[in-house]
Swiss-Prot record:
It is found in: Mitochondrion. This is Small ribosomal subunit protein uS9m. The keyword Repressor does not apply. Transmembrane segments: none annotated.
Length: 336
């Protein structure tokens, strides 16, 4: 059998493959594969891949073909380049509330708004809210607040009490200096079903001539005045102060508000007064002057209030009773 094979392949030249040649070929293939893998990781295009043996090159192309099919034809940079900033903002979803990811977003947003406004106007002077105003202007109830927030069972009564506490603190700001922003917030949370008995006095301003117009009462006297900055001239019913009030105590009463604020001789007063005697007329003008000074400078109100000039004296003369000589005086007792 061996002789037949030798005679059959005698005319052929079969090269012998030595061991050192096979190891050299193996090392060469290992180096070529390592270079191809490093180039594929560091580059992005297939044109920069180094040349290798045909069989390894075909295998490399066969392995890379599925990855190229999965890759998107448009990169992220190409997509953003085709859109402007306005379109990107429309595509991006942004929550409407800053507290969207909280447990109670609507209520927390309301509380943050009230705290910011309270911190902004914390330096303004405060007042004592009268009971009549509290009864006439009530805030919305718990059920109305639930309907307003649309948060269901997330809003508890303790949350509602925290809200009312902040609203009451905002309501204590002086009416003469209350900002429009605070007034809008208070009206937003005020109950519409409660009838407004008290009409809140708005801040008075100067007229086109720079005058402050006010009026006041004392006993049966009614005084209307115009106050303007000047040299300290006072006219009462068209007459000078000394001519109309010969009594020195009446003149002191009239000028007392200027002494409280240390503004003597800096304003002109034009007054019209009717009814009563010189005491009632002079004090009626005094209260009217105090109100006019607040129009010029609202910060003077605490000093004038402390002096008792912002609230008129409501005492009047007691009437005469039957069987009495005067209001309480009885006639002289005579035995016979």
């Amino acid at each position: 059998m061996a002789l037949r094979l030798i005679t059959r392949f005698r005319g052929l030249n079969i090269p012998q493959r030595s061991l050192h040649q096979s190891t050299f070929r193996l090392n060469e293939t290992i180096q070529s594969t390592t270079t191809t893998t490093t180039t594929t990781t560091t580059t992005t295009t297939s044109d920069e891949i180094p040349t290798t043996k045909p069989r390894f090159q075909s295998r490399f192309r066969r392995n890379q073909q599925p990855h190229q099919q999965q890759r998107s034809p448009y990169t992220s940079s190409q997509v953003t380049e085709n859109l402007n900033i306005g379109e990107i903002n429309r595509v991006r979803t942004v929550p409407t509330l800053m507290t969207y990811y909280g447990g109670n977003p609507v209520h927390e947003d309301n509380m943050n708004r009230l705290r910011a406004v309270l911190k902004k106007y914390q330096q303004l002077p405060v007042r004592v809210v009268p009971d009549r105003e509290i009864q006439s202007q009530k805030f919305i109830g718990f059920d109305d607040y639930l309907e307003k927030t649309q948060s269901g069972t997330r809003v508890k009564k303790i949350h509602y009490r925290e809200l009312i506490t902040l609203l009451n603190r905002l309501r204590t700001i002086d009416l003469e200096l209350m900002p429009l922003e605070v007034s809008e917030i208070l009206s937003e949370y005020t109950s519409k079903s409660v009838s407004k008995i008290v009409q809140l006095s708005r801040e008075k301003t100067l007229d086109c001539f720079g005058r402050a117009k006010t009026q006041a009462k004392r006993k049966s006297s009614i005084a209307k005045i115009y106050l303007v900055k000047g040299e300290g001239e006072v006219l009462v019913n068209g007459k000078s102060l000394i001519e109309f009030f010969p009594n020195i105590y009446a003149r002191k009463n009239l000028l007392y508000p200027f002494q409280v604020v240390e503004q003597e001789g800096k304003y002109n007063v034009f007054a019209q007064v009717t009814g009563g005697g010189y005491t009632g007329q002079s004090e009626a003008i005094m209260y009217a002057i105090a109100k006019a000074l607040v129009v010029f400078n609202p910060l003077l109100k605490p000093r004038l209030s402390k002096a008792g000039l912002m609230k008129s004296d409501t005492r009047i003369v007691e009437r005469k009773k039957p069987g009495k000589v005067k209001a309480r005086k009885s006639p002289t007792w005579v035995k016979r």
